[in-house]
Regions:
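A transmembrane-helix-recognition feature enriched in membrane-embedded lipid enzymes
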Residues: 1-63, 115-119
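Soluble catalytic domains of membrane acyltransferases
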Residues: 57-167
């Protein structure tokens, strides 16, 4: 990814979150009130829009094949290699609705992003603590058992190599 595309991606990422702060607050109030339908409606509308916007701004095209093979009547666990910053927007734009993601704990410290991620159903994992990693995987399992799909990048970080990196979770 060129430095200009990376800069454009992060400007769009945070610009979108700032411009849609009111919507974030509305979703958080709905979550606090137990109104999961409103939270889901907001997440299902804004996360794909944000993802497609990133791809458009950075000149990335997306073609998805095989959506018909993804069950609509039960949750799935999507497991993928993590090659670039684009992996998340590509997945979130390409799938029919957003899914929770197992994410490194450092992302929980980024203002606004962490709040959207929590609404999305992300689980934050401490990669250097085996017990905490197991708890995070148990939390992700509970989400899937509750009927929501989930995304895991088992390498634990972006990896540029051609072969599969060491699995960290």
């Amino acid at each position: 990814m060129s430095i200009l595309r990376t800069i454009a991606m992060f400007i769009y990422l945070f610009g979108y979150m700032i411009l849609h702060y009111g919507i974030l607050r509305r979703a958080e109030r709905a979550a606090a009130a137990g109104d999961t339908a409103t939270v889901e409606q907001i997440v299902n509308q804004h996360i794909p829009r944000w993802s497609r916007g990133i791809l458009k701004v950075t000149g990335v095209s997306l073609s998805v094949e095989g959506l018909e093979n993804i069950p609509k009547d039960r949750p799935c666990v999507f497991v993928a290699n993590h090659r670039s910053y684009y992996d998340i927007p590509l997945l979130l734009a390409g799938l029919e609705k957003p899914h929770g993601i197992l994410a490194k704990e450092e992302l929980e410290k980024i203002p606004l992003l962490n709040r959207w991620m929590k609404l999305l159903g992300c689980v934050f994992v401490q990669r250097d603590d085996v017990r905490a990693s197991v708890r995070a995987l148990n939390d992700a399992t509970a989400i899937v058992e509750g009927g929501r799909s989930f995304v895991i990048f088992p390498e634990g970080t972006r990896y540029k190599g051609e072969e599969l990196s060491l699995i960290h979770i």
